[in-house]
């Protein structure tokens, strides 16, 4: 269901993606969208989301697209290694992110996209959560830095349900029965006071903590439960999916 008419030109990549992916999502999911109208109709913005499945960029794109925006993701650079996929992702305006060494390039591209008026989607956790109960874990600073530098609104988005469609690092989707995918868009995170200060590591950390707290609050509302007081930290507790990823 289109809630808000798209104002941007889709281009061939988005037209192809929407034509193939949206019917599949409608056939395999039941969406429960909350407060999607908070996504700005125009202008640069950052949507900061929790990450629970390799499929959740598609389910997230569904709500963004149907509220009249084309999502621009910070996508893992490895996805651009295939020539055909690279052509598709580039045409769709997606932004490659190197895991090591060239993060500044992706950051600059994301800042420029927001300044051009794009809707940029960021997963502050940087990868699928490793929390045993799938709560948002500790995060990286990208969403905070983009929001602080551009002055654009950073909206927290909590999501739940995509992990039932495709569990983390599983190769087998569970398509039947249809899975309920719930997404809740929060009010913009309060960052104006931090924007008045020098962009120091401490200021960026405070902004990152606020964004993660706001995302977690949305997930708590969806799940009707309270997140742990302390976030899962892979640097301390390790990666329980390490063996599964290498298999």
Segments (PLM) and residue ranges:
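A cross-family acyltransferase "interaction/gating" segment
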Residues: 133-202, 232-238, 242-246
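Hydrophobic/aromatic ligand-binding patch that stacks against planar heteroaromatic rings
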Residues: 88, 112, 145-149
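Catalytic-site beta-strand/loop segments enriched in glycine and acidic/polar residues
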Residues: 113-143
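Short, flexible loop/turn segments with low-complexity composition
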Residues: 221-236
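A transmembrane-helix-recognition feature enriched in membrane-embedded lipid enzymes
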Residues: 2-41, 59, 83-92
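A charged, well-structured terminal subsegment
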Residues: 108-113, 181-217, 221
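Catalytic core of membrane glycerolipid acyltransferases/transacylases, capturing the structured
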Residues: 40-101
